[in-house]
Amino acid sequence: KEDSLDVNFLISEGELVKVRKIIIEGNSKTYENVIRRELMIFPGDTFSRKKLLESYRDIFMLNFFRDITPNVVPVGNDEIDVIFDIEEKESGQANFSMGYSGVTGFQGGGGFQFPNFLGKGQLLSISYNRGLSNSYQFSANQSESISQSFNIEFQEPWLFDTPNLVGGSFYYQEKGQTN
C-alpha cells in the first residue's frame, strides 16, 4: 500500500468593504486637489489594494513629497477610511555657473526652477546667462563681445482640471560688440 496525504485548503476572503472617506494630511504647501487628481481610489468604491498602491505610486511620482504613508482605518463593519499621511519636501532648485574659455571668454549664469509652483503642481523655470570675451585685432584695437540670454518657461499639467498639459517659454538672446 502506498502512502498518501490529502491536503485540503479552505480559503475564505474577508467581507468586501466600501471606502467611506479619503483623507489627506500633512500637505501644507501643495493644494489638496493636486494630490486628489492622482488618486485611483474614491469614496464609495469597493476597497481595492491594487488601486490604493496605484494611488500611492502616482502621488509619489509627482516628486513633491519626501514620504507618503497610506493608512486604512476600519469604520464600522463594512466601511473604511483611507488616510494618506504626506510629508512634503523642498522642491525648488537653484543653479549657478561660471567659466572661462580662450574662445568664448568669461561666462556665467544662473537660474531657478520651481516644479510645484505656488503648490499647484505647475512648473516655473527662469534662467539668465551672460558672456564677455576680449579679442585683439591686427590694428591693435581691442573689442569686447558680449552675449546674454534669458529664458522663462511655464507648464500647467492639468489645464482646466483635465489631464492636458499646456506650457510655453520665452527665450531672448542678445549678442553685440563694443570697441
Residue ranges: model-predicted function:
Residues K1-P74, E90-G92:
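Acidic, glycine-rich low-complexity/disordered segments
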Residues S48-N179:
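Gram-negative/organellar outer-membrane beta-barrel architecture
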